[in-house]
Amino acid sequence: MGVCISHEYSKPTAQETEIQQQFSNFSKVDERPPMAVEHQMYDYRQAYEEQDDELFAIICCPHSIGFDRDKIALIDLDPTSDTYCTIISEIRLTSNGDEPGRMNWAKSAESLIEMDKLIRKNIIVPCMNSGKIYVIGFDKNKFYMEKSKNIFKLQEIRSDELFRKDVSCPYAVRSLPLKGAPVHVSTMGDRYGHGKGDFVLIDRKTWEIRKKSDPTFSSFGGDFSLQPRHNLLISSEWGHPRLFRDGFQPSELENVSESFGSCLHVWQISPPKLLQSIGLDSFDGSLVISVKFLHNTDCNHAFAISAIGSSIFHLHMNTLSREWQADRVAHVPSLKVENWVSDEMPALLTDMIISMDDRWLYVCGFLHGIVWRFDIQDPFRVSLHGKINLGGVFDSSPEVRIKTSNAMEDRWWLPPETRSLPRGTKFRGGPALMQLSKDGSRLYVCNSFYKAWDGQFYPELISDGGQMVRVDIVDNEMRLNKKFLVDMKDQPNGPFVIRDIKFLDGDCTSDSFL
């Protein structure tokens, strides 16, 4: 996909010039190669030994049917608490059908050891369907709508403010650990719902949108990741919002579709500038849904996954030419099936998590119902290390069968397993989004990604609501915790689904280290 030019831009302000100077100072500190094969990783056990385990989590809960408002909720994760696995605080968004995307804190820690010291007061919630961006305050385990200068006005960035800048469908949020730096929010469409990859910059003092000093945008937008030490941003491509909001067509699951992007874009953060666009294979890279840098700031390596292409890519830079390239290091093959919407079923990779020590990569297959664990200590030679079954189409719809006789011998595949969860329930849908504890011992998994996709493949998610489960990493094996379950089926005014998970003191996805 190509890159286009916008018409609305302005010269850098004095504050933006100061931020650019901060970046230039950091870029001169260290000119070492980006990474050795045996790279130095965070000793998370030493940094984390005096910290409590995560006791609370903020989760995003869209209303599954849409006749009531979505909400953001605080969940008790303390096993010794009387309110374990229940909502102890919540706040409703202001309108129906917002459909929140990937929320995040407005502040980022500079390093792992600074995470527990950082005071996080505001969480940014972008909404894919309504186009709004909410600023929600959080203090003493309570939510409140952040006020603007007019104390009577609830703080939300309305969709018409984005339309005036010809952007829509805000999706992901990242923050820089620099004083005065804005919050970055990726957008995936123009005002008409056509594909357009751009960014909205939000001032952390006024919560107003800053003017862009660079007019460039990409054909499609999606997820993105920041590497402040190297002044880099990498963004991915989804597709046209007006099309993916209606779910998938059967042909799009088997063939290359122009509805979805297959590129990764490397940007300079400040001053903003597109450095390179990386075209992936049109099918293997179809719908690049997530991209993440390693946590180690000395390493500017990253990983990306594609949903329909069901592939994992390793991104790295040639130190001589300074050119980036993306190598496909793993591919989950589609399964030939019958009695389903298509003759082939991709894994539909929807999320990935890199452990804080940069040793492990977790990837979830929404349709196959499997979470895979990869060893990425050598990012050029990624190896599959473990897997666990959590629902999936074959568990949800027994009439769907696999045609290939050797599927059970496939190293990627696990036969569907109906697991008995607390309160006599089973895991509905498939693994969609994840969060990992900082010590890498607990993987939290929820089963909603986007309601149009949820309802298409798993109608029971819409009728019965979402869930969150916990997978414990014990002796390098993934084991489902039978005592943990958050179930939204019987919530008042529900049902709700569960999407996105954030810990109060930061997690493996919240911060962009410097």
Swiss-Prot record:
Signal sequence interval, chain numbering: none
Coiled coil: none
Record-linked InterPro entries: Se-bd
Keyword tRNA processing: no
Keyword Methyltransferase in annotation: no
Domain of life of the source: Eukaryota
Pfam families to which the protein is assigned, alphabetical: SBP56 (PF05694)
Keyword annotations: Selenium
GO MF, one example: selenium binding
Family: Belongs to the selenium-binding protein family.
PANTHER family, A to Z: METHANETHIOL OXIDASE, SELENIUM-BINDING PROTEIN-RELATED
Protein name: Putative selenium-binding protein
Organism: Caenorhabditis briggsae
